Amino acid sequence: LRSLVGSEMCIRDRYTVASIDELYLFLTNTTAVEYIRNFMKRVRKKESSVILASQNLEDFNIEGIRELTKPLFSIPTHTFLFNAGNTDARFYIDTLQLEESEYELIKYPQRGACLYKCGSERYNLIVHAPDYKSKLFGDKGGR
């Protein structure tokens, strides 16, 4: 991961995006978490970004790793937050540094509804997929 993504993003002058899906697979490795955190800070200087994707916020709340993962939520300049599911509300609010009013916008599941954070600005978004994408992903939560 480090050599492939690092060299690719550093060789290009700018506008490169890397995505890490199923992030929970890396969270038990402190070296990987530190690398991801440092990498996220460096790529911003090249107008590039790293997209982190995880289904469960509680995966970041592992004893001994919590202190390393918390900064991952303050680094991104753009954040899309969807309904938290069964995650404890206080934990969700504290971890993602939300106001109560922001949490209220995504407290209940609504198809396509999310809170978009961009710097100090907040937007309540409804994401719509074009028909051709809806056919690809279906209407059963991505299946």
Role assignments for model-derived ranges:
Residues 13-15, 47:
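A general structural motif
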Residues 126-143:
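Charge-patterned, long linear interaction tracts outside catalytic cores
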Residues 25-36, 61-64:
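Conserved ATPase-coupling elements of RecA-like P-loop NTPase cores
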Residues 39-125:
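Conserved ATP-driven motor cores of ASCE-family P-loop NTPases powering translocation/secretion/packaging/pilus
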Residues 18-19, 52:
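Residue-level marker for buried hydrophobic side chains located in beta-strands
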Residues 1-6, 10-11:
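Single conserved hydrophobic/aromatic residue that forms the stacking wall/gate
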Residues 15, 21-23:
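Walker B catalytic acidic pair
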